[in-house]
Amino acid sequence: MTLLASISSIGNVKSISKSNNFSSLSNSSLQSSNSIQCGGCGGGSPLIGTVGNLVGGVLVGTGIIVGTVIGTVNGVVGGLLNGPNCGCH
């Protein structure tokens, strides 16, 4: 559990530091961050959310569009695992 918390915090730091570089694309980066972070309500989703945050934080440096796609996929997977009321809407 401590390892997952550490990984999650590393992902958050990366996404915060990269968002300053993309200040002109603030709307896209905010949308990307929101998509990546949604993914769960319920028992099985915290791991998916943690992995999504880590991957999203790394991918913000390579492309906002890629981060948005990963976030959308994460939301769909979270919705499928947790039922119709969970995930990104």
From Swiss-Prot:
Query: Per its UniProt record, what Pfam families does this chain match?
Result: Coiled
A single GO BP term for this record reads:
sorocarp development
User: Disulfide connectivity?
Assistant: none
Give the family this protein belongs to, as stated in its UniProt record: Belongs to the hssA/B family.
Q: What is this protein called?
A: HssA/B-like protein 10
Species annotation = Dictyostelium discoideum
